[in-house]
């Protein structure tokens, strides 16, 4: 990996961001079906530019990672409650996983959550098959917790997810 750049995505980046989010959801839904033996239907596999508004300022943040100028990963913050933000759609292209792109994005999200969004708590959910992601989250001080209010995971499927939280200093 030659050059990693992280930056806030703007409207000019929508095609790259939507492409990465669609790749993530396609992979996640296929892996879910392969792992658990049934399909999870989701309209979220079809992201739109308008849907990205929930991840943009003033109540969110959308980060695009680029390696050598090409889209490499995406991650988002979304406000939940006063002082609480949620990490969503964190994804690194498979061929770049293991090269610290995800850890760099997570570190930036945590910094921006505290400094720019005034968050005291960061939450996230992650399917149980995403064990590499769990190690990353735990290495940054996230602890497992019960499902939280506002999670988009249906109640009947929550046992297949891990829910995390970290208090910011």
Please give the residue ranges for each predicted region.
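Conserved acyl-CoA
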Residues: 104-121
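Conserved beta-strand in the GNAT
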Residues: 64, 70-78, 86, 91
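A short helix-loop-beta-strand connector motif used in the catalytic cores of GNAT acetyltransferases and
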Residues: 49-63
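Glycine-rich acyl-CoA binding loop
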Residues: 73, 87-89, 98-106
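C-terminal "cap" of GNAT-fold acetyltransferases
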Residues: 2, 120-123, 127-169
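A conserved beta-turn-beta hairpin within the catalytic core of GNAT-like acetyltransferases
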Residues: 79-90, 97, 116-118
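Conserved N-terminal entry element of GNAT/NAT acetyltransferase domains
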Residues: 1-19, 168-169
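Conserved GNAT-fold acetyl-CoA-binding loop/helix
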Residues: 4, 8-11, 22-51
């Amino acid at each position: 990996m030659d050059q990693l750049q992280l930056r806030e995505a703007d409207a000019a980046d929508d095609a790259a961001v939507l492409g990465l989010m669609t790749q993530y959801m396609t992979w996640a839904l296929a892996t879910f079906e392969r792992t658990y033996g049934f399909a999870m239907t989701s309209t979220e596999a079809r992201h739109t530019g308008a849907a990205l508004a929930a991840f943009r300022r003033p109540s969110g943040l959308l980060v695009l990672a680029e390696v050598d100028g090409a889209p490499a990963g995406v991650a988002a913050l979304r406000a939940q409650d006063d002082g609480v933000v949620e990490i969503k759609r964190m994804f690194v292209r498979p061929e770049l996983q293991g090269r610290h792109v995800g850890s760099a994005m997570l570190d930036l999200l945590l910094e921006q959550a505290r400094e720019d969004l005034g968050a005291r708590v960061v939450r996230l959910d992650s399917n149980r098959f995403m064990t590499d992601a769990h190690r990353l989250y735990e290495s940054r001080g996230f602890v497992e917790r019960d499902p939280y209010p506002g999670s988009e995971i249906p109640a009947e499927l929550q046992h297949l997810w891990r829910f995390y939280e970290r208090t910011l200093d």
